[in-house]
Amino acid sequence: MNSMTEQKALELAIKEIEKKFGKETFSQSESFDNQVIKSGSILLDNAIGVGGYPKGKIIEIYGNESSGKTTIALQCVKECIKEGGSVAYIDAECSIDSKYLSHLGIDPTKLLVATPEYGEQAFSIIDALIKTNMVDLIVVDSVAALVPKNDIESSMEDQSMGTHARMMSKGLKILQTSLSKHKTTVIFINQVREKIGVMFGNNEITTGGRALKFFSTLRLDVRRSELIKSGTDVIGIRSKITVTKNKVAPPFKNCFVDIFFNKGFDPTKEIIDFAIEYEIIKKSGSWFYYNETKLAQGRNNLDSYLKENNEIYDEIKKLVFDEIDKNNK
């Protein structure tokens, strides 16, 4: 069989398969390549390695309490809406607040919010939204709050082991099938628990069993590292984000992001951090210089100066992105 005959035989086989199972059976491998939703943090986009959260994939953001997981997810919501995307929020915890959304720069009227009564209903809603092909991003808050219907309807004495994990496994299989044909990104917010009886090594485990680990293209481990203060007032937290699983770029990269209360990320500050790291802005003593020009004395004054001088800031920003692109090639 020569190469032309083999190619023709393959084309005929593909036509037969598409005739039997539908035109969407096959797609080009490049169909979702380089399509991302920005995280809102240049540092995090750089750690992920492709410039943001990949479209058409499942993402897990997990960590301990008060580490910034929800705000990190909401920053992605903000970026998606800013680019004209459609976003749904599955509020299983019933904790979303319109005032907080407004503080983060998110218009609450542009966010579709669902509050499912039980876990299976949440998965049905997510699957239906994916199949519309009209929703770009779905955030699920949180895995621990996706309680199986059987657990809700049963008495405390009748609770059985493993129902949550089984529900997650079944639901994720359904979502994965739908996502293979659509562009929606689904972010699951998850918590960590301590394993009982573990004396040595890592005693932490995420809720919901192993299925989410398996189906996730990207897993982000979020840990609060320190408080950000202005004088004696706590104005935010610094969190370490580690990419523990990455199927679109090399894994295990990490970054430290500053999350300010009622604001979220500060992109301007991150640009300045990168500019100093790449020596686009140079430091001598307490003074900062750009192209031999003295900008400001002290980091706070530098931040204020660049926020007030847009032309110089935009010039530095372009150089930073050029450097990031060069390093990611």
Swiss-Prot record:
PROSITE patterns: RECA_1 (PS00321), RECA_2 (PS50162), RECA_3 (PS50163). It is found in: Cytoplasm. GO terms for cellular component: cytosol. GO terms for molecular function: ATP binding; ATP hydrolysis activity; ATP-dependent DNA damage sensor activity; damaged DNA binding; single-stranded DNA binding. Coiled coil: none annotated. Gene3D superfamilies: P-loop containing nucleotide triphosphate hydrolases (3.40.50.300). ATP binds at residues 63-70. InterPro entries: AAA+_ATPase, DNA_recomb/repair_RecA, DNA_recomb/repair_RecA_CS, P-loop_NTPase, RecA-like_C, RecA-like_N, RecA_ATP-bd, RecA_C_sf. The keyword GTP-binding does not apply. Keywords: ATP-binding, Cytoplasm, DNA damage, DNA recombination, DNA repair, DNA-binding, Nucleotide-binding, SOS response. It comes from the Bacteria. One of its GO terms (biological process) is DNA recombination. Pfam families: RecA, RecA_C. HAMAP family: RecA. Can catalyze the hydrolysis of ATP in the presence of single-stranded DNA, the ATP-dependent uptake of single-stranded DNA by duplex DNA, and the ATP-dependent hybridization of homologous single-stranded DNAs. It interacts with LexA causing its activation and leading to its autocatalytic cleavage. Belongs to the RecA family. This is Protein RecA.
